A protein has these predicted regions:
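Cytochrome P450 heme-thiolate monooxygenase catalytic core
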Residues: 99-106, 140-336
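Short, small-residue alpha-helix embedded
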Residues: 331-344, 494
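C-terminal helix/juxtamembrane-tail motif
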Residues: 2-4, 520-539
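Cytochrome P450 C-terminal beta-domain/meander region
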Residues: 67, 72, 374-392, 403-430
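Cytochrome P450 I-helix active-site segment
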Residues: 206-213, 344-400, 422-423, 448, ...
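N-terminal membrane-proximal hinge/A-helix region immediately C-terminal to the signal-anchor transmembrane segment
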Residues: 3-124, 149-150, 154, 182, ...
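Cytochrome P450 heme-binding "Cys pocket" and the immediately downstream C-terminal segment
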Residues: 196-197, 347-350, 460, 466-467, ...
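Conserved cytochrome P450 K-helix/beta-meander segment immediately N-terminal to the heme-binding cysteine loop
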Residues: 429-461
């Protein structure tokens, strides 16, 4: 045998090994090979799903794949998607951890509760603040009640009234901008207190600047989120796959939030909070998180948060605050946009909704004769039409319709009929598909609020149970949206305040179609409605 044949044989052996590892094994032998492929290339390459995400077509293409192949689909050599209740229960209530994908939600270089990878760390963070986002606290909080009263009666409704009375009312107002301003003022008031929160409703020029910074970064998350190692590699070579102005925008948003935190900290530590008799100025979330961290610090090195939250307490608080205000304003703003768009197409529905809202005591009719009050949360929750309109909007136009990835546990797990799925496989579900199960939601692309009106839809108990089980706008399990009760409460208050006093008409809805991705609003980021004041002469 010649010496030349040795490297040749070695090359052949390497080639055979490579073919086995990257083609034969993933395609024919791996436990994942038994799972249907979303695309012919998925067993050997992630290019299809990466390109799909880059083109912002993930939600629709994954939904089509599930319709064709069933509840478990393979998206890449090491990635799966699930779309049934059993899969949701396994993944989101079965100890599947988060992974690298969520690190993009870190702020100031430190994780927030949402971006933490491991459940133990997440649970420790969640215990600090979960009580103040509970339904009982949300419904009974004097601070939130007064914050809502000021935001609705002293900020939002005067703006809506002025646009309705304006000679240019026929031009309409961009309610997507208006609703986002409203929800931002709501969440920052609960975080920092009304005094130290935002006033985006009355500061139009700055809110437009802030929102422009916030939304301009969205199209540049693909590389750091889906290809973080490649992004870092090219960055070391001096090639930045993300424009530098995106970093500048992030820094400005972080600086703005840190300024809110510093003012709130001074308000508390300077003794001003204790002397302030206005409940609206109570920084509910900030104070609770600060107290939780101080309590956790007593555990010292034994705390699971010792290397993160306790090491950088101020930045950890700021990271949590920016996560809450970002998610808290945008998702609810999107929901209000689509809700108002839907009901603006049906004046009879608006009249029925208003009639129901006027049964509240106190109701939310504008009146110059007395100080306006906020109706009780319990009474709001007992309004079936209001609840139905909101639930159907959250179903069809979930603000976060995209995938919620997790990592399979080691050594292996089972998903549906597929066994021995190895650890470290990315797997997720998306509300876009869960909410479009035609067996649960007939004609799923149709907005039909009567799905949620049990006195009218004729559903059996089993149908109602399945309908509720498949509602996934806030995810599920121990890491579901912590702010779901807050969101439902503020949205019902905003709808009640507006539709007790006004009718809305569509002026311009070009670009109202929902984008594709993780958090998704209108493609145009706009919706123009005209408001018409309803004068109640009996009040």
């Amino acid at each position: 045998m010649s010496l030349l044949s040795i490297p040749i044989l070695a090359s052949i052996a390497i080639l055979i090994a490579a073919i086995y590892k990257f083609i034969v094994y993933p395609t024919l032998i791996s436990p994942l090979s038994k799972i249907p492929n979303a695309h012919w290339s998925t067993p050997i390459s992630p290019i299809w799903i990466l390109w799909t995400r880059y083109q912002c077509q993930e939600n629709r293409k994954l939904h089509a794949a599930h319709l064709k192949h069933g509840p478990v689909v393979r998206l890449a050599p090491n990635e799966l998607s699930v779309n049934d209740i059993g899969g949701l229960r396994t993944v989101y209530a079965g100890g599947f951890e988060k992974g690298q994908w969520y690190s993009i939600f870190d702020n100031y270089g430190v994780p927030c509760m949402f971006s933490t990878w491991h459940s133990r760390t997440h649970s420790a963070r969640k215990r600090m603040i979960s009580n103040i986002y509970s339904k009982s606290i949300i419904h009974s909080s004097p601070a939130l009640a007064e914050q809502a009263r000021v935001i609705l009666y002293e900020r939002l409704l005067p703006i809506v009234t002025s646009t309705a009375d304006s000679a240019r009312s026929s031009d309409g107002v961009d309610v997507h901008d208006l609703w986002n301003a409203t929800t931002m003022d709501f969440i920052t008031a609960y975080l920092f207190g009304l005094k130290n929160g935002s006033n985006f409703l009355q500061n139009e020029s700055y809110r437009r600047h802030w929102f422009q910074l916030y939304h301009s970064r969205k199209t540049y998350t693909f590389f750091p989120q889906e290809l973080p190692r490649s992004s870092q590699f090219f960055k070391r070579l001096g090639i930045n796959l993300t424009p530098t102005w995106v970093d500048d925008a992030n820094q400005e948003l972080e600086a703005w939030t840190k300024d809110r935190c510093d003012h709130t900290s001074g308000f508390i530590n300077g003794g001003f909070a204790a002397k302030d008799s206005d409940p609206a100025n109570e920084p509910v979330v900030f104070t609770t998180l600060l107290s939780g961290i101080e309590k956790e610090q007593k555990k010292g090195s034994e705390s699971v948060l010792n290397d993160t939250t306790l090491r950088f307490p101020e930045l950890s608080i700021a990271s949590e605050m920016i996560d809450h205000l970002a998610a808290g304003h945008e998702t609810s703003g999107i929901t209000m946009t689509y809700l108002s768009w839907q009901v603006s197409q049906d004046l009879a529905l608006q009249d029925d909704l208003r009639a129901e809202l006027l049964t509240l005591s106190p109701n939310m009719l504008l009146s110059a004769s007395s100080k306006q009050s906020i109706p009780s949360s319990k009474d709001l929750d007992n309004l079936p039409l209001l609840h139905a309109v909101l639930m159907e909007t959250l179903r069809l136009r979930a603000a976060i319709p995209g995938g919620q990835p997790r990592m399979t546990p080691y050594p292996s797990c089972t998903l549906g009929k597929f066994t021995e799925i190895p650890g470290g496989v990315r797997v997720g579900a998306q509300a876009h598909s869960v909410h479009r199960n035609a067996q649960v939601y007939p004609d799923p692309e149709k907005w039909d609020h009567k799905r949620w009106l049990d006195t009218e839809n004729g559903y059996s108990e089993e149908q109602r149970r399945e309908r509720d089980r498949h509602f996934w706008a806030f995810s599920s399990g121990g890491r579901m949206c912590i702010g779901s009760n807050f969101a439902m409460h503020e949205l019902k208050l905003i709808v009640a305040a507006v539709y007790s006093n006004f009718r809305t008409y569509i002026v311009k809805d070009e670009g109202i179609e929902q984008t594709d991705g993780y958090t998704c609003g209108p493609a145009s980021n706009k919706l123009f409605l005209r408001f018409e004041r309803i004068i109640d002469h009996s009040s």
